[in-house]
A protein has these predicted regions:
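Glycine-rich, acidic/polar active-site loops that bind/position phosphate-bearing ligands
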Residues: 1-197, 206-467
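Glycine-rich N-terminal segment of FAD-binding domains in flavoprotein oxidoreductases
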Residues: 201
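C-terminal amphipathic alpha-helical interaction region
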Residues: 393, 399-601
Length: 601
């Protein structure tokens, strides 16, 4: 949108996000003012502007729909967000010995140790003292900055942890999430730790995500996505619930584009995170509610038991222990394989990458839901006719219509399974497996119209610029990783292998000098395998250099992204397989890169 010599831009304070002060060196302090950033011509050059526009758009659409059903007291609606931030913490001294971790944020080579996460003994276990000191100090600093941190715990992989705050208005929650990442990075450094926000820093163990718990509230603080005791007769809940499902059905590919990054590409669909197929999980009770509404029948009895006014549980669980009270079971279990799941009174967008800002995914989700709300409001206006407000039967008629339309997106099973891949294809749900393919969804005519006309949160140039930036960032990331791997091979991996090979060769010479038969000596087999592996790695390094050169010379950034995906990534994966085998063979004293067993334990 702007050429190199056009440099003027403007910042405007976002008054919905409070100012804050951070301590700086030499007993000084810095006042930070959250702002939007626009160009001389008024184009949005940041992520905050589009998010604020989407918040305004969804508020207008939601208020319009609420007024149609008689909720005329509501003047404004806000989207709320609670962000679960996952990350790894490793020793900073060891991290500095790994150029790939320092430069790329992930290990480009490294074999999985015998023990990693298979015992499932790290999740929710006791935190190491240095980690606990780091996270608790981070929480204290964040409290001073107004960030309402709430929970912390061990995650599944060794060295992996999570922090989460109380939900807030979406734009403020995004600001606070970015602030959390910054403060955690700074505090970890003081404790001689390195925080890794990369989605897949270690191959073979779980990666990290950023679960975005999204909901809609009125200006009086009522959560619109709270099902209440009888969701089947709650018109407000039903309308907004089905609107969100329909939004994902219509624009799931757009949500896939929002989470497409070079780092998240390593995590999605890896049997540890949601797949690249966007679907919606509702749970048994709400599935039954929608099915009953669609079929115009009574809902099955779920033995609802209410504990307090804010918590609706399912059946009672009696542990048969006199000293323990019975507890109320939730109406629905969690499906951790679903990328977009309803969890009690909110939707959890689980596919967002741990390193990326939540702003863009939430912006596109808001836009998709806004379009759905407007479409549903149009239908409801037609059906209610001359009546002042729509009746419950009018609402159910419209809801029924959109239940049928959006049914293909609902899936309650295992999203990791091959059966779901095949079933999704039958339902016509796209399976987008690469970033370049996902980026193109932003300029798909249907999605582009939503973002620039129906819900105008971007101008056409703004949207095209983001498409260009996504491709450019993807290409640069892979070029950096490819060049880093080249350096690792030349400066670390091959020299280590040659040193060990020299020792084995000298051992064989000594054995031969003593008159021993070395033709079947185990040293000879090891020597030959090292030779085979180093030869193959060297050949593939040449292929990698050619791929890097070809991508670097490609002027069309979209074509360059496709080449980077198909050529650079493939060669890097091939190299890694041989290097990881070599790591298992070379004696530890010769292997100059810290191994997973040292980094994670």
């Amino acid at each position: 949108m702007r050429t190199t010599f056009e440099a003027r831009g403007y910042t405007v304070w976002d008054t919905t996000s409070p100012l804050f002060i951070q301590q700086a060196p030499h007993n000084t302090a810095v006042l930070y003012i959250p702002c939007v950033f626009i160009s001389y011509n008024g184009e949005a050059l940041d992520e905050k502007t589009a998010l604020l526009r989407s918040n305004e758009a969804i508020s207008h659409a939601a208020v319009r729909l609420l007024h149609l059903i008689g909720n005329t007291d509501t003047k404004r609606v806000i989207t709320t967000l609670g962000v679960e931030q996952e990350f790894f913490l490793i020793d900073r001294g060891l991290c500095t010995l790994r150029p790939d971790l320092k430069i790329c944020g992930r290990t480009l080579v490294g074999s999985v140790p015998p023990k990693h996460q298979q015992l499932e003994d790290h999740y929710f276990g006791k935190m190491p003292s240095r980690v606990l000191a780091t996270i608790s100090e981070t929480e204290i600093e964040l409290f001073k900055l107004g960030v309402p941190m709430k929970t912390r715990h061990n995650e599944v992989a060794p060295g992996q942890f999570e922090m989460a705050p109380i939900f807030e208005e979406a734009a403020l929650a995004v600001d606070h999430n970015l602030l959390t990442m910054e403060v955690l990075h700074r505090v970890a450094h003081r404790h001689k730790l390195k925080v890794l926000f990369h989605e897949k820093p270690f191959k073979g163990v779980n990666g990290s995500g950023k679960h975005c718990n999204w909901s809609i509230s009125t200006d009086t603080g009522e959560n619109i996505l709270d099902p209440s005791v009888k969701p089947e007769t709650n018109p407000r809940f039903l309308l907004f619930f089905i609107a969100t499902i329909y939004a994902v059905y219509r624009h799931g590919a757009l949500l896939r584009a929002a989470i497409a990054t070079s780092s998240n590409e390593h995590r999605l669909g890896a049997n540890e995170a949601p797949p690249g197929i966007i679907s919606v999980f509702l749970g048994d009770q709400l599935n039954e509610v929608l099915n009953a509404v669609e079929e115009q029948r009574e809902i099955k009895n779920f033995s609802q038991h209410q504990i307090q006014s804010v918590k609706v549980g399912g059946t009672i669980l009696d542990l048969k222990i006199a000293t323990l009270p019975p507890i109320s079971r939730d109406l629905t279990d969690r499906n951790r394989t679903s990328p977009f799941a309803f969890t009690g009174n909110k939707f959890e967008f689980r596919a967002v990458g741990s390193k990326q800002s939540p702003s863009f995914p939430v912006t596109l989700l808001n836009a998709a839901v806004t379009a759905a709300l407007n479409e549903i409001a149009n239908e409801l206006e037609k059906i209610k006719g001359d009546k002042t407000f729509a009746s419950l039967e009018d609402v159910l008629t419209v809801v029924r219509m959109y239940i049928k339309k959006s049914k293909p997106i609902r899936f309650e099973g295992d999203n990791y399974s091959q059966e779901w891949v095949e079933e999704a294809a039958r339902r016509g749900i796209p399976n987008i497996t690469s970033c370049p393919e996902a980026f193109k969804m932003m300029l798909d005519p249907v999605h582009q119209k939503i973002l620039t006309e129906t819900v105008p949160i971007f101008t056409v140039p703004e949207l095209q610029s983001r498409y260009h930036i996504q491709n450019e960032k993807y290409v640069k990331d892979l070029l950096i990783e490819g060049n880093t791997l080249k350096g690792l091979i030349s400066q670390y991996i091959i020299p280590s292998a040659f040193e060990y090979r020299k020792e084995i060769a000298e051992s064989l010479v000594s054995l031969n000098a003593l008159g021993m038969d070395v033709s079947s000596a185990p040293e000879k087999a090891v020597l030959e395998r090292i030779g085979e592996l180093t030869t193959k790695i060297t050949q593939l390094k040449g292929d990698l250099e050619k791929a890097i050169a070809e991508v670097s010379e490609t002027q069309d950034i979209v074509l360059a992204a496709e080449k980077a995906h198909h050529e650079i990534l493939k060669v890097m994966d091939d190299i890694r397989g041989y290097v990881d085998e070599l790591e298992q063979i070379v004696a530890d004293k010769y292997w100059s890169l810290p191994k997973y067993s040292e980094l994670l334990f």
